[in-house]
Structures are given as C-alpha cells and as structure tokens.
Amino acid sequence: LNQTALTRRSPAWGRLAAYLQKRQFWLYRNTDAAYFGEGESFFRDLVEHLRQAETYIFMEYYILAEGTVWDEIFAVLKERAAAGVEIHLIIDDFGTLTRLSDGTLQAIKDAGIEVEIFNPVHRYINRLYFNYRDHRKITVIDGYVAYAGGINIGDEYANRIERFGYWKDSTVRLTGDGAWGFAVQFMQMWKMLGRHFP
C-alpha cells in the first residue's frame, strides 16, 4: 500500500499507515468493510458466511456461551466440519467459565472442531497471570472474510436474553485481502498455545 498516496488523501491516514508499517503491521488494499451496530444482524451475517466456508474457519472469542445463538452457529460448524472444512476455535477459560458446560465442550470436539482453551483457570495460578486473558472476538473464513469487534458469542449480545440491559455493541466484517491479517493473528495465537496446523 502506498503511504504517500494515502497521505495525499488524508494526512491522518498517512500517519496511521506510517505508524503501522513502522511496527511491521501489514497494510491491505482490495478490502470491503461492513459495519454491524448490534448483535442480531451480526449473527445473521456470520451464520450466512459460515455456511459458505470451503477450506477453514478460525474463531477466537473471550466468551462462548450456551444458548440459541451458539446452537445456530454450532449447527453450521458441525455441518461444515462434516464436509471437510478445518475448524479451529480458541476460547478464554475465564470468559467461558460459567457459560460453557463440559458436555458442550466435548460435543464441539466430537464434531471434529479443534479447540484450545486460553489460560486455563486453576487454583495454583499466579495472580499476575490470572488477569492474562484473551479478549479477542474474531472469526476468519477461508482467509477472505473476517469479523472483528466487541461482540462475544452469547444470547445477550443478540438481545435474546437480558443480562445487563439492552446490549449495544458492534462488529465489522472485512471481505478481501484485509481478512488475511486476522488469519495471521489467529495462527500466531494457535502456535503460541503449542498447536500446529496440518
């Protein structure tokens, strides 16, 4: 991406591009973005795109909660896994501690989905590392579609149940080359957790 051309269009964009490039982040072109200002529309769009996955799906969430939202997503993931799509899931142990049963976790694994639990909670954990959490909320589909934002997987994020009042949060979908940056982030975390790709 040409930083000079960006600077001509907007000095602020040029400064941001320079900042990112200096820190060795990749900049992408050929990318469209769609904004979702609430959970229900995001989940509808996510399920639609998950159905189209052909090669792989990466999902990384702080909270994955049992409920109707997860049931809809899991039904599609099971179908795609049975069709040969590789599915890798990272969930934060503390975020899902009371929201995901051992039975559901086993069902996910039994469906052929590779799962990694980030920073498992146990009684001997050092207080310093207890707060070391994975708050990412991303999904990557075939390296071409990526979602990132503030919405976890749970019914309250779609306002199907009320836990803390009406839930207002957002997510963006990137379609195109820019989705690859999220795929790289996920793969780096997967490898950091001691896992490998076939």
Q: Where would I find each of the regions flagged by the language model?
A:
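N-terminal localization/anchoring segments of enzymes in phospholipid and broader phosphate metabolism
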Residues: 1-198
